[in-house]
Amino acid sequence: MPYLDMPPAQVERVVCSITAAIKYQVPANIMLAIAEKEGGRPGLENKNRNSNGTYDIGRMQFNTVYLKDLEKYGITEEDVAQPGCYSYDLAAWRIRGHIKNDKGDIWTKAANYHSKTPQFNKVYRTDLIRKAA
């Protein structure tokens, strides 16, 4: 069933973001804003290393540092890189953790998905608020 006149990748982003937001109890506007901001593609193509040696994977640009926590469940880079809703679920799981456990307002906590470094968090936070409005 077609959804309005959106391209397939955008339909995936909207449907998967809202489904993951409900599943992990993350505000849908925050999940949609992060999905729009990240805007990655399926696959392992982003091998740009961060200063800590990690890199981002897939549609939600899921950082490899979090794979250490997911290893015990058998979750691999290849799993995160697949098209479909799985990467959105993993992102919502992470965002939920930030909202529950981090300090600050909800926007700062949500921006921790990108970075906890204040200067990077602030820029990302400002853009999230704009996108979520």
Regions found by a protein language model. Give the residues of each.
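Catalytic glycan-binding domains that act on GlcNAc-containing polysaccharides
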Residues: P2-A133
